[in-house]
Amino acid sequence: MAPTPDRDGQDKKVCLGVVTGAHGVRGLVRVKPYTEMPEGVAAYGPVETKDGATSFAISLKGMAKDLVICKLEGVDDRDVAAALRGTELYVPRERLPRASGDEEGWYYADLIGLRAVGLDGRDYGRIAGVENFGAGDLLEIAPAEGGQTVLMGFTDENVPEVDIAGGRVVIDPPAGTFGDDAEAERGE
């Protein structure tokens, strides 16, 4: 399958995790995985930085709580490993298997840039990200009229339809999510 161009015309990449710091003195790194199974961080071949400027062969070395300990090729001492803190690790979308659990087979990364449309057709804006700060998945929506992004729970009730082919996510936001009373019609 050919990669799908993103908004900037670049091939789509999926972030598998982020380096949280060094582990030991031999250049190992701690990685917070964004994959379903933590070891998935090292399962899809070499990883690269978001801009694609640096690529690393990656191997799994162990686990530490909710983090994965990895070896990145070319990172051989603690100082270099520590300097990578905050670096997100990506792979091209086409390296990943078809997403399971949904007949369309999509990943959260596929939602970025899609229109967020209400049940009534109202244009709420575009999906800017999918976040999880520990209490569940959240859609980050950049409002159509501009301003700060809005976070909304990514639940079946709030997001009744994801239409990748149509370039949209149908949302039913809770009252007050977008700072107006239009959502109050939901009857809650």
UniProtKB/Swiss-Prot annotation:
PANTHER family: RIBOSOME MATURATION FACTOR RIMM. One of its GO terms (molecular function) is ribosome binding. The keyword Transmembrane does not apply. It comes from the Bacteria. It is found in: Cytoplasm. Belongs to the RimM family. HAMAP family: Ribosome_mat_RimM (MF_00014). One of its GO terms (biological process) is rRNA processing. Residues 103-177 form the PRC barrel domain. Binds ribosomal protein uS19. Pfam families: PRC_RimM, RimM. This is Ribosome maturation factor RimM. One of its GO terms (cellular component) is cytoplasm. Keywords: Chaperone, Cytoplasm, Ribosome biogenesis, rRNA processing.
